[in-house]
Each structure stands twice: as C-alpha cells, then as structure tokens.
C-alpha cells in the first residue's frame, strides 16, 4: 500500500517538471515580464489543459518561427498572476493554492475564460462568491458581465440589492452608473420592488412602515 509521501511525490511530478524546467520547449511571459522573469513550460502540458493554447502553438506564426524556443506573451496578466496560473495548470489533482486563489481570483477568472479552462473558472467563481460583501459586490457584478456568468451575476446582484442603501451612497456606485447605465437601472428597479414588497401597513394609522 502506497504511503502518503509516495502519493505526494506522484502528484507532484508535473510540478517538479515545471520547477526543474526539464525539456521545457516554450517560454511564457506576462505583460509586465522581461526576459529574466519568463516562465519555461512544456507545450504538451499547455495543450492538454487548454484548446486555446493548442491553437496558439499550432498557428502559422509559431510553425514558421526559426527560434529554438518560442515565446507566448499573456499580456493581460502580471507575472505573479501568471505564476499562479501556470502552477494550477501543472497540478494533476485540479487544485490551486488557496492563498493564490484569494489573491488572484479575478485575474484568474478572466484567464480561465480566455484560455478555456472551465474548472479554474469554477474555482475562481466559488472564491468570488464566498468573498462577496457590500464593498466588492459592484466590481464582482461587473466582472460577471463579459462574458455573462449567471452563476456569479445573481449572487452579486442580490448582495447589491440587499445593501443598496450603503452601496448607493458611495462614489463607486456613481462611477458604476456612468459605466453601466442599464445595469444600474436594473438594480434600482429591483431595489424599489424589494422595498415595496417588504413594507407593511400599520393597522392603526394605515401608513406604511
């Protein structure tokens, strides 16, 4: 019977491959990276995880390249975010470091969509939902729009409606209204509906309270 340490060694094989850069054949760069902060990776691993990476690496641009090692630049990501992204790709158990997930949930959510890695998107969505509060609900609702993600949109929308008196008085809401007027109208309509259905009539004076 295999011991836990043997299992850990087995599961960590791909991570070791990444760390030791053994037979690495592609260089990954973030938008803020230079040549000294590139991440050396393996095409087969990237292709196995993402159809988008497969299309990139099979494109005419890369096939025609005379370079010994091609570079893929993920310009939308910072180097630290790219490190977390690549580390996830190399994990065979489908998990991600909780600290990395908490810190980079939004950027990884975008990356998961762009590079078509649904499981990572699910993990990021769950983290974002668990962290929802009145101070971040607007930005998370905004994040859920492109592409539209109902599973993230709905709890963010509900959080906003529940805390509308606090949220609507802040400067962030004014900016949100300017950038997303249609969404703002939906929020106000839902808030009015919620308010009207929650009000009761006093039996003595026939006034709402």
Swiss-Prot record:
SMART domains: BTB. Keywords: Ubl conjugation pathway. GO terms for biological process: protein ubiquitination. Pathway: Protein modification; protein ubiquitination. Gene3D superfamilies: 1.25.40.420, Potassium Channel Kv1.1, Chain A. It comes from the Eukaryota. PROSITE patterns: BTB. Residues 24-98 form the BTB domain. InterPro entries: At1g01640-like, BTB/POZ_dom, SKP1/BTB/POZ_sf. The BTB/POZ domain mediates the interaction with some component of ubiquitin ligase complexes. May act as a substrate-specific adapter of an E3 ubiquitin-protein ligase complex (CUL3-RBX1-BTB) which mediates the ubiquitination and subsequent proteasomal degradation of target proteins. PANTHER family: BTB DOMAIN-CONTAINING PROTEIN (PTHR47274:SF3), BTB/POZ DOMAIN CONTAINING PROTEIN, EXPRESSED-RELATED (PTHR47274). This is Putative BTB/POZ domain-containing protein At2g40450.
